Amino acid sequence: MLAIDQGTKFYIKLNYPLSNFGTPAIIDWGFFKLLFVENKGMAMGAKLNDFLPFISDNTAKLILTIFRLIAIVGLGYWLWNSIKKQTHPLLNWALTLIFAGAIGNIIDSVFYGVIFSDSYGKVAEIFPEKGYAPLFYGHVVDMLQFPLVEWKWPSWIPWIGGEKYLFFQYIFNVADTAISTGVGILIVFNKKVFPKSI
């Protein structure tokens, strides 16, 4: 999973410039689009300083990256311990998917700023003389979108009435899919993977 994630990200970065709003998708099949965007924050583009406005973008990015590294260590320990204790295979699969996805995204955050040039209006170069950001300040590469249904909210609904809405508008990557699948397994099969102690 990690190899597929990094392979797709390298392919996108080394073959396409960043997708800007209004520019055509790399692939557009209606229900599926292949794009190239970079996420400087966390899920759905949110940044830590969106919630804590008194910290700078750089401080927010560093805190987020350090938190992700600590979470990966904890997740790795949980996975190692689960395998050692021979817990339910679904738990091990779920944790492996989450761990691989987390590693995939942390590679982007920690190293991509150093090993790639920027992609604004041009295709990135690998191992340039100077990368687009220092170590720990890279951006996560996202490229997959499934815009399934678009509608306009009825005008009588407060705050959002008359607004257009696109379901599933978010752009994500293979690592995000692995994390979501792992979490989904834990939720759907929670009674199997977390049996009650007697």
Where are these regions (language model features)?
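Alpha-helical transmembrane bundles and membrane-interface segments of multipass inner-membrane proteins
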Residues: 1-198
